[in-house]
């Protein structure tokens, strides 16, 4: 049996913390869209750090048995998207994150977003 959305979210947040991801926020998408229950947005310090963070998250999700994992952006590591079903993870380099500003689009005023940590 694979983990539910809350278990998947906890696993992702723990791994992001262990991997020293920065400025991690969680956006509650329930009732807003059918793409997932949660969105996690975080930053890595460099291309290499973004790739390493994403790799560690993927390994943990695979070990936990999360089905249907999809990943985009790994070769370049400016922005890596991990679709874990009910939880979507975006790992950015800081400049790319500032440019796309997903937090503003999905959680205006950050009322629906919470900082991890």
Where are the model-predicted features located?
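Long, contiguous binding/interaction regions
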Residues: 1-31, 45-52, 59, 64, ...
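A short, glycine/Asx- and small/polar-enriched loop/turn
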Residues: 33-37, 83-86
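Short hydrophobic/aromatic beta-strand micro-patches
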Residues: 41-43
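Basic, polyanion-binding surface patches
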Residues: 67
């Amino acid at each position: 049996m694979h983990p539910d959305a809350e278990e998947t979210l906890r696993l992702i947040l723990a791994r992001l913390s262990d991997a020293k991801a920065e400025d991690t926020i969680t956006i509650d998408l329930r009732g807003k869209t059918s793409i997932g229950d949660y969105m996690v947005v975080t930053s890595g310090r460099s291309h290499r750090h973004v790739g390493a963070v994403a790799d560690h998250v993927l390994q943990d999700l695979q070990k936990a048995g999360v089905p249907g994992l999809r990943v985009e952006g790994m070769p370049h590591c400016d922005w890596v998207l991990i679709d874990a079903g009910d939880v979507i993870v975006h790992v950015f380099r800081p400049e790319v994150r500032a440019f796309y500003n997903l937090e503003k689009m999905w959680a205006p005023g950050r009322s629906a977003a919470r900082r991890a940590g």
